[in-house]
Amino acid sequence: MQVDLLSSAQSAHTLHLFHQHSPLVHCMTNDVVQTFTANTLLALGASPAMVIETEEASQFAAIASALLINVGTLTQPRAQAMRAAVEQAKSSQTPWTLDPVAVGALDYRRHFCHELLSFKPAAIRGNASEIMALAGVANGGRGVDTTDAAVNAIPAAQTLARETGAIVVVTGEVDYVTDGHRAVGIHGGDPLMTKVVGTGCALSAVVAACCALPGDMLENVASACHWMKQAGERAVARSEGPGSFVPHFLDALWQLTQEVQA
């Protein structure tokens, strides 16, 4: 399958839409990344909410623009709340995104993620090892880290997309986004982004938000990857290391939104 490139004009158009619609994103994400995820969404103009109580999660999924399910710090009570939210999202036609953190390394979350696939996510975002494991190609990864190159996961991503109907994102040195029939590659970013906890998880939240936008969902999701890589490059140019990267990254996201409004 040919891998196309996303144009800067497409990315800018989607960011303009993002700012106009300001999606309300219900983030059922892991404990390690909640603040960074919320700040990333805010910097881009979205509205984050972290609602985890089972009864509230179901109720909120019905009114949110989009739902994120991230299994990074999964527990049985949290799985119950996530299941309720996903069931309600399907009923309410709220697009939801799955981030199958470490799905290839741990059995409980692998079974849980496979169960959730029956509720038809709008998007799935993971590293190469996670996507390959979720597709049943291989069980791999070193915890949350990948042991495979993103390009090697393209066939698995295409299969997973066709089987689930989801837009599948494989992140790495190059991000690949596919609906099973088309594929887009997004270059850029910097290795320093892997030295900060939460950049991938925050991307999943932005992907979730983009699934709520009008237009071509594949292009919208690919645009999310492009913004994060752009902001990463800008932040690295101003940073001395991981500690100073985070505030510069959030500033860079904010600046991107200001540029498309100018």
Swiss-Prot record:
Cofactor: Mg(2+)
CDD domains on file: THZ_kinase (cd01170)
GO biological process: thiamine biosynthetic process; thiamine diphosphate biosynthetic process
HAMAP family from the UniProt entry: Thz_kinase
Enzyme's top EC category: transferase
Catalyses which reaction(s): 5-(2-hydroxyethyl)-4-methylthiazole + ATP = 4-methyl-5-(2-phosphooxyethyl)-thiazole + ADP + H(+)
Residues where substrate binds: 50, 198
UniProt xrefs under Pfam families: HK (PF02110)
Keywords of this entry: ATP-binding, Kinase, Magnesium, Metal-binding, Nucleotide-binding, Thiamine biosynthesis, Transferase
GN (gene name): thiM
Protein's name according to its UniProt entry: Hydroxyethylthiazole kinase
Residues reported in the UniProt entry to bind ATP: 125, 171
Protein's pathway: Cofactor biosynthesis; thiamine diphosphate biosynthesis; 4-methyl-5-(2-phosphoethyl)-thiazole from 5-(2-hydroxyethyl)-4-methylthiazole: step 1/1
Family membership noted in the UniProt record: Belongs to the Thz kinase family.
InterPro entries, A to Z: Hyethyz_kinase, Ribokinase-like
Molecular function via GO: ATP binding; hydroxyethylthiazole kinase activity; magnesium ion binding
EC number(s) reported in the record: 2.7.1.50
Role according to the record: Catalyzes the phosphorylation of the hydroxyl group of 4-methyl-5-beta-hydroxyethylthiazole (THZ).
